[in-house]
Design a protein with these regions (language model features):
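Alpha-helical interface subdomain recognition
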Residues: 1-111
């Protein structure tokens, strides 16, 4: 972690993790306040963003570790595989992006 690029990668990961946490909290609050149906845009945004970003963060960690990152000496390869499978659990990312995109266009009376 003493290498400058690795410090930047760690910083970006921390920033993205914080952003994901806030997005999850926003979706949870929307579910509590608005109800599940009205909160679907927030939930879809989280379902699209979180698994994708977590895969990117794990991939960056694998890159930092080099060949060791894909070996059984670290949990990274298993973590990546598990997270990649999770991206399919709630449906394709494209479906969630469609929900968010349509809602955004409806705000401006374009859809």
């Amino acid at each position: 972690a003493k290498l400058g690029k690795n410090i930047e990668v760690i910083s970006r990961a921390r920033i993205e993790i914080n952003a994901m946490r806030l997005a999850v909290l926003q979706a949870a609050k929307a579910m509590d306040v608005l109800g599940n149906k009205e909160a679907r845009v927030y939930v879809s945004a989280v379902k699209a963003m979180v698994p994708e970003k977590v895969c990117e963060i794990i991939d960056a960690a694998i890159q930092m570790h080099g060949a060791t990152g894909i070996s059984q000496w670290t949990p990274l390869a298993t973590m990546y595989t598990d997270m990649r499978h999770l991206r399919f659990a709630d449906g394709p990312d494209e479906v969630h992006h469609m929900v968010v995109g349509r809602a955004e266009l409806q705000k401006y009376d374009v859809w």
